[in-house]
Amino acid sequence: RAIELLKEAEARLPDEWRIPYWIGFNYLQINEYEKAATYYKKAAKLPGALPFLETSSVHILSRGENLSMAVAEAERLLASSKDQDTIDLMKLRLDWLKTMQFLENVNRDFKKKVGRYPQRLQELVEHGILTTLPRDEFGEGFYLVYPGDFDKGYMVRSNF
């Protein structure tokens, strides 16, 4: 119901950045990451918006199931930004996202070889698929979101 009310407010006050921000925040709370990112991007374009909104969509999308969307958003921001700090941040984020994509692909290879997804990332080394695990240069360490899950066991994320 909160989202519905906020959307009504947005229709009445289309230039108020706080309203799409709060709509996005509410979507974030119910794990609808694509919708949350859409509203954060919308808020970022409005007058007076806080600077963090411009790049927050990349972080939000990285929490969802499709890292490709986060990569595409980071690449879009990198290509369109004239601010060196944003450029540097997006380069770092892209490396981080692509490392997670790499690990997800390696997890799929693991499943082909072993018949299941790994319970721990270290199993990728133990089974000779990788010689070492990549370092998480941006966050606090990569982890499996659903260790051993038959369908989603490939998913890798990082907290930062």
Predicted regions, residues:
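Low-complexity, acidic interaction segments enriched in glycine
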Residues: 4-12, 17, 21-29, 33-46, ...
